[in-house]
């Protein structure tokens, strides 16, 4: 993949993200998420599943009204009813999820491959004939014979599909496997390829990046990696990593913290403190004496500009703790208006380290004042 290439992020927080066990968005929350996604610059937003009923159709219409720039997409099963309901939303892009693995065909649908090919051709042609843009996704593609995936893509293309999605539905691929699968299909089918990765082994983001290197032009993501089981590829991680490599995704990186917070609140799923890009206030904090001494002299010693806090609208923090050295501790003391000579530093460090072990957090200015005051008290006579 060459630098300066453009890739499209297709966010499915409102569809696959909401399929997370126990997650259910209100209409107000859906609108807020849609607005935040649109401000952040994602190319496409899967806005829901119209086949859930008329209430969902009404909500999709309301959500779409909040989207100014991104392309809304309605997700469909391979059923005429789903297409009919999707059309009621007024959305002009639909996606058909097509089961492809033996387990899916035999265990879920009780059909064979020929039936899948016929239904795909018929429904894609029907949707295209109605003036809709259609993408087709191979569900459970990572457990499907690549030759059948190619046949399905050819059938979909002939019927009018504009894109083919590879779904690693159970999150079984590793980065090398993702690269090989996408590279093979990219070389053998005419449709642009979208990668949809799940995170069951913690590799969804890496698999998505490797799919981009292998030729995928569209990448399916969710905010905070929200999604079924272990989740999906995280929008903020995929976007930031690609942008760091010179790949344009259209994302406003400074909008990612707000987007992440909106989804975390609506989903009730807090992300871990050290989550890349959008973690808590300590994410861009430095404590280690070696690091702090260097970064105070020159920021890029331990902060590459491609992942510097300002790139994401964040701020660097120098915190004091067990591993602080003289440079960081002296800076903190001076900032707090406290004495910072070598004698104070030498006496303060043992107190500071014991305090850090006890409280399990960075040492704050108030803590430093109390410790310095303790040092100033006369020692009891023996």
UniProtKB/Swiss-Prot annotation:
Similarity comment: family membership: Belongs to the alpha-IPM synthase/homocitrate synthase family.
**UniProt xrefs under SUPFAM superfamilies:** Aldolase
Q: What's this chain's function?
A: This protein is a Fe-Mo-cofactor biosynthetic component.
Enumerate the InterPro entries for this protein: AIPM/Hcit_synth_CS, Aldolase_TIM, LeuA/HCS_post-cat, NifV/FrbC, PYR_CT
Q: Which residues form the signal peptide?
A: none
Molecular function per GO:
homocitrate synthase activity
Q: What are the record keywords, sorted?
A: Nitrogen fixation, Transferase
Q: What is its EC number?
A: 2.3.3.14
Example GO BP: carboxylic acid metabolic process
Q: Which domain of life is it from?
A: Bacteria
Domain annotation Pyruvate carboxyltransferase: ranges: 7-257
NCBIfam families this protein is in?
nifV_homocitr (TIGR02660)
Q: Give the catalysed reaction(s), semicolon-separated.
A: acetyl-CoA + 2-oxoglutarate + H2O = (2R)-homocitrate + CoA + H(+)
In its UniProt entry, what is this protein called?
Homocitrate synthase
CDD domains reported for this sequence: DRE_TIM_NifV (cd07939)
Q: Which Pfam families match?
A: HCS_D2 (PF22617), HMGL-like (PF00682)
């Amino acid at each position: 993949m060459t630098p300066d290439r453009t890739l499209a992020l297709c966010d499915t927080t409102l569809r696959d993200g909401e399929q997370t066990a126990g997650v259910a968005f209100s209409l107000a929350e859906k609108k807020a998420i849609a607005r935040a996604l649109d401000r952040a610059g994602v190319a496409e937003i899967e806005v829901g599943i119209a086949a859930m009923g008329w209430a969902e159709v009404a909500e999709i219409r309301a959500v779409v009204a909040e989207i100014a720039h991104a392309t809304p997409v309605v997700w469909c099963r391979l059923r005429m009813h789903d297409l009919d309901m999707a059309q009621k939303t007024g959305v002009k892009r639909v996606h058909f999820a097509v089961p492809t693995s033996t387990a899916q065909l035999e265990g879920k649908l009780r059909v064979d491959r020929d039936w899948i090919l016929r239904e795909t051709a018929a429904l894609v042609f029907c949707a295209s004939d109605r003036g809709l843009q259609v993408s087709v996704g191979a569900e459970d593609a990572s457990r499907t014979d690549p030759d059948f995936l190619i046949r399905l893509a050819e059938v979909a293309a002939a019927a009018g599909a504009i894109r083919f999605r590879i779904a690693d539905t159970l999150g079984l691929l590793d980065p090398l496997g993702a690269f090989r699968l996408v590279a093979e299909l990219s070389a053998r089918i005419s449709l642009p390829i979208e990668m949809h990765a799940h995170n069951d082994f913690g590799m969804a983001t890496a698999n998505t990046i490797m799919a981009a290197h292998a030729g995928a032009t569209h990448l399916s993501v969710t905010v905070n990696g929200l999604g079924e089981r272990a989740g999906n590829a995280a929008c903020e991680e995929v976007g930031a990593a690609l942008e760091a490599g010179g790949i344009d995704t259209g994302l406003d990186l400074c909008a990612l913290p707000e987007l992440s917070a909106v989804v975390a609140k609506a989903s009730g799923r807090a992300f871990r403190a050290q989550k890349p890009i959008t973690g808590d206030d300590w994410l861009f904090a430095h404590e280690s004496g070696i690091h702090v001494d260097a970064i105070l002299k020159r920021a890029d010693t331990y902060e590459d500009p491609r992942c510097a806090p300002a790139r994401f609208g964040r701020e660097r923090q120098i915190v004091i703790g067990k591993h602080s050295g003289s440079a960081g501790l002296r800076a903190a003391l001076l900032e707090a208006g406290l004495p910072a000579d070598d004698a104070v530093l030498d006496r303060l460090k043992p107190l500071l380290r014991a305090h850090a072990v006890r409280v399990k957090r960075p040492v704050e200015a108030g803590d430093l004042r109390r410790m310095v005051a303790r040092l100033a008290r006369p020692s009891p006579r023996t």
